């Protein structure tokens, strides 16, 4: 599941090494890459992916997930059976799967509004963490981390230099993400993140949703921005009835509880976009990278408690 954005470069390197391809797909590139480099293949990949390869020679299963965890990967070992899927609901169809509620995940969810470990709300079902790969052999699963961000803590560039570097990286990344056989569109709100990506992407089509309350709708701002850069904008207003009626469907698709009310808007946004396109750019992730939420300030606010005297 996913897309390998640098597969053409890898394919060229593998052909030079003697590999013979029968297609021009990133999936086949993964197979030849594993044959050439083994587990080290993941160090060369750029993209969003979750995949497995059955090694017929070594009789083992190799699988990996991208460094940001964009593509999901779930697994379970129960009743002498190893299960894996992109969605937890897929396990429900298997006769060896035991559907048992995981109370430990509930405690984490109520404390942090998400589950910070690899556990899920189903006992025995785990998610492969971002930037990890696994080898399943002789009934045993060994998981390894292949990517870890490196923050030195030293940064001596000026604000303007940093901004220029971010822009350079963003432009290059968006260009990679636009490699597609079909039209690429963009989600658009009035926020800086989606507006910036939309501008960089130079797409023809944008999609926006808003609520049936003026103060909670960004439709007009999004339309004005799209018009200013000569892009088409499709907008949908979500009514209160549509909001409440959609919750059961959203929960079904999410598999687990999600403490983000924006999931409703994203559901309708995706539903509208899917009527016309298959690929969209999204501003998801910018707040996490640049500390855009108040919750990221909480550790600093609580530092004063470190100085409270210990009891005698």
Report residues per predicted region.
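Cysteine-centered catalytic environments shared across enzyme families
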Residues: 1-254, 266, 270
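Active-site adenylate/phosphate-handling loop in enzymes that bind or generate adenylated species
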Residues: 67, 268-312
């Amino acid at each position: 599941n996913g897309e390998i954005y640098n597969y053409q470069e890898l394919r060229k390197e593998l052909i030079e090494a003697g590999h013979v391809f029968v297609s021009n797909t990133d999936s086949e590139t993964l197979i030849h890459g594993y044959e050439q480099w083994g587990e080290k293949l993941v160090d060369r990949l750029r993209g969003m992916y979750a995949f497995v390869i059955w090694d017929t020679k070594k009789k083992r299963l190799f699988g990996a997930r991208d460094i940001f965890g964009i593509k999901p990967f779930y697994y379970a070992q129960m009743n002498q059976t190893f299960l894996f899927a992109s969605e937890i609901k897929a396990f429900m169809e298997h006769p060896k799967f035991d559907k048992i509620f995981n109370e430990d995940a509930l405690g984490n969810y109520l404390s942090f509004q998400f589950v910070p470990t690899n556990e899920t709300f189903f006992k025995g079902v785990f998610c492969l963490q971002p930037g990890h790969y696994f080898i399943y052999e002789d009934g045993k699963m060994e998981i390894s981390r292949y990517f870890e961000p490196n923050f030195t803590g030293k940064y001596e560039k000026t604000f303007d230099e940093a901004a220029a570097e971010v822009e350079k990286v963003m432009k290059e990344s968006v260009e990679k993400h636009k490699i597609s056989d079909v039209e690429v569109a963009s989600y658009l709100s009035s926020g800086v993140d989606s507006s910036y990506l939309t501008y960089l992407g130079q797409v023809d089509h944008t999609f926006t949703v808003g609520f049936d309350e003026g103060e909670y709708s960004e439709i007009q701002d999004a339309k004005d921005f799209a018009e200013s850069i000569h892009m088409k904008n499709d907008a949908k207003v979500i009514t209160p009835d549509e909001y409440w009626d959609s919750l059961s469907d959203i929960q079904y698709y999410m598999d687990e509880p999600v403490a983000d009310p924006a999931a409703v808007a994203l559901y309708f946004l995706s539903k509208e976009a899917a009527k016309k396109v298959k690929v969209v750019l999204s501003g998801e992730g910018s707040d996490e990278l640049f500390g855009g939420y108040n919750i990221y300030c909480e550790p600093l606010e609580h530092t004063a408690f470190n100085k409270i005297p210990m009891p005698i």
